Amino acid sequence: LSEITDYDSKLIEELFIKYAKVNTRSDANSHTVPTTVGQVKLAKMVEKDLHDLGIADAKYEPENSYVIGSLPSNSDKDLSAIGFIAHLDTADYNAENIQPQVHPNYDGGEIVLNAEKQMVLSPKEFPLLKHYVGQRVITTDGTTLLGADDKAGVAAIFGALKYFLTHPDVEHGDVKVAFGPDEEIGRGAKRFPAKEFGTEFAYTLDNGQPGQIEAETFNASEAKIDIRGTAVHPGDAYGLMVNAVTLANEIMSALPKDEVPEKSRDHQGFILVTDMTATVGEAHLNLIIREFDTQKYRRNLALLHQIVDRINDQYDSPRVSLKINEQYQNIGDTVKQHPYIVNLALNVYHQLGITPSITPFRGGTDGNAITAKGIPTPNLFNGGDNFHGPYEYVSTEAMTKTAQVVSEIVQEHVREYGHRDESPVKLN
């Protein structure tokens, strides 16, 4: 096994800070690809840095905004290619003038983020900080997010690539890497060039602590309900008025009372009314449906149709219309058919002394769209925490550990050649 000191932590930290300073906040209201110019700027930086590192075929593809590169196999074995993927955009939070702050040899106490705003990063509020004692912790200055989601993943992939390039005697198969746009708004991977990428499977490095592997996600849909009322003067309304507000309330009352985000965790799903506008004459509801269990997910979609049909049956003509847009499918249904992908990562965790944690991801990742395109893609980790806000942080050591895991997965793929661990994986 490689040693953690075999990895260039200085390069990893420098690249992370350089990339973090680029504003790559994605914009759900934009219709360009990518949605913001900062993502193009960073993609071209990543392309150049890959070339400088020694990845000769690295290229930025304007048609999909992905940067793709590969490390050719040096093995005489007929090894399938493995992919590693990270995203370049950041969440919908201030990303202008990001100034990463490095705190060497973190002592376990409070970290002052911004004295003027009296903002501190405290282990009392964020207990996972205690795991970073003695490490080089990188934080915000309290005015922006940091962008460890997912620039920590980007930097870690660079660290793994450099390991192989500086250790040419280490046997490996083809390694493909991809860095893409607009993950935070669920668009980027829809354009992922799966045929060109051509790996048997891949991993995203999107959030989470060392040892984490997320091999299942929600099934997800969004629903739009439009209600047509009949508005008349209240004094003359008998037998005439149809109050769209009342119908909207009837719909919401028919939804499962306990299947809401504030009452669900682990493998429990939910139906959430995200917003509503309502007058007597018309009402509009937007909902999201999230569920791990595919059969229950289908039942919940059917339930919405039943509720709408039941109301419409009370009137001479339909008053309520329902449109459902299916957003992504649970990758677990596919990953269960390919247990080697999860076992490969778990075996590496055990070898490195990392405690594994198979957790359901209560959301979606780029892996959903990529899996749907034929490349099973669970999520690992990037070592950061408190994503999407001013308390976000990561450590140089955690990113370096991520690089080591990436490298060892590639090497374990060689070691298991001809005798893969295909034992069933229990996800739930």
Feature locations, PLM:
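Active-site metal-coordination/substrate-binding segment of hydrolases
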Residues: 78-174
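Short coil/turn connectors at secondary-structure junctions
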Residues: 76-82, 133-135, 169-175, 197-201, ...
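Short, conserved micro-motifs enriched in small and acidic residues
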Residues: 37, 144-155, 238-246, 393-400
